Amino acid sequence: MNTNQIILTNQNDNSVNVWSNVTQDLYNYYGEALYNSWFSKVNFIESSLNTVILCAPTNFIRDWIKSKYSVVILQLFQHYNNAIKTVEIITKELPASNQATLELPTKTFADIGSSELNSENIFSTFDIRFTFDNFVVGAPNELAYAVARAVAESSSAVSESNPLFLYGGVGLGKTHLMHAIGWYIKQNNPSRKVIYMSAEKFMYQFVKALRNKEVMSFKEKFRSVDVLMIDDIQFICGKDSTQEEFFHTFNTLIDNNRQMVISCDRSPSDLDDIEDRIKSRLGWGLVADVHSTTYELRLGILESKIEQMNVKVPKDVIDFLASKIVSNVRELEGALNKVIAHSNFTAKEITLENTQNILRDLLRSNERIITVEDIQKKVANRYNIKLSDMSSPRRMRTIARPRQIAMYLSKILTPKSLVDIGKKFGKKDHTTVMHAIKKVEELLESDLELREEINLMMKILQN
């Protein structure tokens, strides 16, 4: 069977259309490889009253889909028909005469024209995996989460945080929050027009509109929405024509009390090769950063993911992943998925030794061993204090604060215990280290300048 096709039984048009939409969503959410491995081999049998019946080609595929994807599939069916309460998956042969072939839609969001902005197709551009309910909140992201939720739940056309500007490193949750905003609005306010798009796609569509002499349609498409979300705005740096169009789109939407949500890998003030008037406007509303994960947040993310997947992972494996995969959430979840998939396909138990072997190449490629000594040197240099001050008993604020920051970074960036960290700082006990970490975490909640300072030092140390 063509991997871009789905086999359907002869059903009424509505059933066929719903199944077509569900398969397109599954394809978008999980990607071509996973879709072709599991969902492309599933047949739609019938829907009656509140039950949908699907057919898998083997017991193994049936059981795998039931255990891993049944909740997602049911949610997708319920989006298109909320009367559906159950999805059953069976295995049996279908007579060829009862089968009809439907090409899997290949249209991407970038291909949607202005005439389709009112359609529910836009709903399917939001990833069902990225909701507020499954976003793990911790000190590094709680402000961004709170304001994103406030924007989504705002009863007025526009929130007080307009525009909302989210910034932080790759894979830390900015895109998750943007999808969560989109999902929430479309579920609770389906009449509102919402566009989510990367800045790169915005530019490509603008160039295409110029080439095809469809600039007015382009303007109408983006300036008539209720909520416009642009991801990775740094992409338009140095692209003068795109900046000009974005500037006027921004002004039109803000003037008309329409909500804007922007994400970036840095704060507005740190953007280079972008017009000052755009920089200024990006900071008009609320600027919230999503900074690097803490060990505790990584633990929470792993535990949440494991619960969603309904699998058992030993605590020492979870601790190992949280300690070693520190770069971003995306890589952390990818490592967990790889370990679980290896166990499922090889029937081998998930153990620390197996995990280390499975992730050997990943760990080696990301191996930037950061030591407490590295951190002490970097922080001492940053704050113009002597390296010896890191282990001295001196309590002057100009020395104590950098020392606390170094302890905080040591906890985040190294696998060292509080006791071991304390030994590196003049044989301080673990309660002193704990107090320092807590103090810095409290400061990070309110001190934007300190947050940016620590984020910068973390990037330097990790790179």
From Swiss-Prot:
GO terms for biological process: DNA replication initiation; regulation of DNA replication. InterPro entries: AAA+_ATPase, Chromosome_initiator_DnaA, Chromosome_initiator_DnaA-like, Chromosome_initiator_DnaA_CS, DnaA_C, DnaA_dom, DnaA_N_dom, DnaA_N_sf. One of its GO terms (molecular function) is ATP binding. It comes from the Bacteria. One of its GO terms (cellular component) is plasma membrane. Residues 84-124 are annotated as: Domain II. SUPFAM superfamilies: P-loop containing nucleoside triphosphate hydrolases (SSF52540), TrpR-like (SSF48295). Residues 125-343 are annotated as: Domain III, AAA+ region. Residues 344-463 are annotated as: Domain IV, binds dsDNA. Keywords: ATP-binding, Cytoplasm, DNA replication, DNA-binding, Lipid-binding, Nucleotide-binding. ATP binds at G171, G173, K174, T175. The keyword Nucleotide-binding applies. It holds the Pfam family DnaA_N. Its main location: cytoplasm. Oligomerizes as a right-handed, spiral filament on DNA at oriC. Domain I is involved in oligomerization and binding regulators, domain II is flexibile and of varying length in different bacteria, domain III forms the AAA+ region, while domain IV binds dsDNA. HAMAP family: DnaA_bact. Belongs to the DnaA family. This is Chromosomal replication initiator protein DnaA. The gene is dnaA.
